[in-house]
Amino acid sequence: MQAKTGVNAKPAAAAAMSVFERYLTVWVFLCIVVGIVLGQLFPPVFQAIGQMEVAKVNLPVGLLIWVMVIPMLVKVDFGALGEVRKHIKGIGVTLFVNWLVKPFSMALLAWLFIRHWFAPLLPPDQIDSYIAGLILLAAAPCTAMVFVWSRLTGGDPLFTLSQVALNDSIMVVAFAPLVGFLLGISAITVPWDTLLTSVVLYIVIPVILAQFLRKALLARGPAVFEATMARIGPWSIAALLITLVLLFAFQGEAILKQPLVIGLLAVPILIQVFFNSALAYWLNRAVGEKHSVACPSALIGASNFFELAVAAAISLFGFNSGAALATVVGVLIEVPVMLLVVYIVNNSKGWYERGASAPVA
């Protein structure tokens, strides 16, 4: 059975990734350079953009986020929730890691590294903001790129689709209280009105619009759906890159003064990626799930819905905040780190199947 999203059941090589996806780290580095240069050359322009707000929501960023996330959410078939029961153990592992381990482990790592061990190397007035950004990054499971990672490992397409649909359904109601709770226990003031507004603007409304668009496109046939997705898919990356240019135009001066900050913020993110992916992979093996289920389960546990994290950080704390910078570090390292995780799970298949009690794929 083929999933409607076009997720291919066959194992794939690097061709499964578009040029934009494959070289995302390069594009992010270019955005850093372009943003810093433009911010230094035309500060009044970016100050004007930063002031284009209504109810603490920056209008240009709001538009860019919609362009960024709606094409991704169109791929999500919430009808796949009916497939959850077919791999209930794998789904259980996914939910456990994504909602009970990942956000809390990131909060702990941020507290250890940012508030304590790295604190002497960081600007004191931004430490809370950095921690908030890391929490936002870990609080939303990956939506779009997990389809790519799953294809690269020969993951079960229906399981991948069902876990994304379930995670996105949970995210609609759980993102705000989870972020609010973790920020609260981290002694960071929670702007609840802005947080709830962000959830409505960047999760609820895009999900509704995306599903209406999905239904309309599928009514015209699968070929129309696939052709439209191929056309609008690059919009997401373009909107992300423009957002990053804006962000680094505001952050440029701080980065030039303390370039080490990006490397320090990457440390807890890297630890979290490898810890959560390894935990999910091992748990799936322990409960006897197939390798084709364990791979996407481990990968969604390792990656983040960084587009939402960037949007929420800007709305809650502003362009100039350490929170916004912390979420962008997640974007910067996403592709190379996830490709390494893909390599590990692909090359450990023999070890996995020797220990799994369920029949292998």
Question: Predicted segments — roles?
Answer:
Residues 1-75, 79-302, 306-361:
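Alpha-helical transmembrane segments of multi-pass small-molecule/ion transporters
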